[in-house]
Amino acid sequence: MSEPNFIIFLTDDQGYGDLSCMGCADFRTPRIDRMARDGARFTDWYSNSPVSSPSRAALLTGRYPGNAGVRSILAGHRTASGLPRSTPTLATQLKQLDYQTYMTGKWHLGLAESSRPHQHGFDRWYGFMAGCIDYYSHIFYWGMNNPGPGINPTHDLWEDGVEQWQDGEYFTEMITAKALAYLRDAAKEDRPFFLYVPYNAPHYPMHAPRAYMDRFADLPWDRQVMAAMLAAVDDSVGAILDEVERLGLADNTCSFFMADNGPSRETRNWL
């Protein structure tokens, strides 16, 4: 067997019980449930941190957050430092084994040039680098009530270090579209690949397309929008795994799904 391909799906602030395979009773996540049914389901899996940046640093480095150099939530301004360039990551190590490496989604490990995805082993990357963005304008609004030079709101959407403008498009679907494009590119090469897909959902702001909201019209609004956001992720995971199958890569691809750090009690929303 040739070297396996790897796909890591990550959700943001998703609760333990927000998937039907983990006990959710008021909505279903059939494609993620299928992963659990056909693979291994971990019922006692612990994040290395209760917040975003340290948990992501631990995932990508295999180190405790403090040893990885990321001990707290990182800032969102464009010169914010983050994961030290000297810290090895899964992407840097796989590149040494001639893997293609791709990321599409949320980074949150620094915006400074030395801390961006391409400095940490990713050949191609797409997404945003701060902690959260509006799902349609792709602007980081945190701190908007206290603006100042270099502070927020800040547009935060990039591809390979070049700022992108796709106003009005839903970010979950944008992540998925880029993942599908990366898969097709990867399949053309006679080399294995690593695809990292860190979704921003269901992190606030609580935004979902009307078509997804309409699926859950019987639920209270707060639960309705949570269900809608996770349904979009579930459909996206399914689309990516279907593409892996279509490309004839399924038998040699290991896919893994997890949440970053559990749910948030915050109530911020930007409309």
What is each PLM-predicted segment?
Residues M1-L271:
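Formylglycine-dependent sulfatase
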